[in-house]
Curated annotation (Swiss-Prot):
Cross-referenced NCBIfam families: PRK00132.1
Keyword Transferase recorded: no
Alphabetical UniProt keywords: Ribonucleoprotein, Ribosomal protein
InterPro entries hit by this protein: Ribosomal_Su5_D2-typ_SF, Ribosomal_uS9, Ribosomal_uS9_bac/plastid, Ribosomal_uS9_CS, Ribsml_uS5_D2-typ_fold_subgr
Protein name stated in the entry: Small ribosomal subunit protein uS9
Membership in a protein family: Belongs to the universal ribosomal protein uS9 family.
Keyword NADP tagged: no
Pfam families listed in its UniProt record: Ribosomal_S9 (PF00380)
Organism for this UniProt entry: Borreliella burgdorferi (strain ATCC 35210 / DSM 4680 / CIP 102532 / B31) (Borrelia burgdorferi)
GO biological process terms on file: translation
GO molecular function, one term: RNA binding
Family matches, as SUPFAM superfamilies: Ribosomal protein S5 domain 2-like
One Gene Ontology cellular component annotation held by this UniProt entry: cytosolic small ribosomal subunit
Amino acid sequence: MKKSNFSNVNLSMGTGRRKSSVARVYIREGSGNIKVNNRDFDSYIQLENLRTMALSPLVLTNTLGKYDLYINVYGGGISGQSGAIRHGISRALFKLDESNKMILRSNGFLTRDSRKVERKKFGQKKARKSFQFSKR
């Protein structure tokens, strides 16, 4: 795992993915400011349950308020983006301090959630749903 030095400040980067969303998370020591796509975290993710889900790695490792986060996220909807942010924060925290590995791994935050939307098949209405069958 590689740490990069950015203007004499220790900076850690993690990439998170979920559904079709990709989040690049940059962490450095600071006062707890969180920016997502140059917007405030609370204004970008407005649903409370998605906010708590995205910040759960910081709460779990007792580092909420100790680091500044700059997050660049694109693709998908707000739920997939929140999951990608959580995955990216977990990876960046692991790169910053490897003692976090056991906590994050046991809660499944370092594992990529591989579930994606199943494609629609021809001859069917949706991915699994068939057209109505008429016997006569």
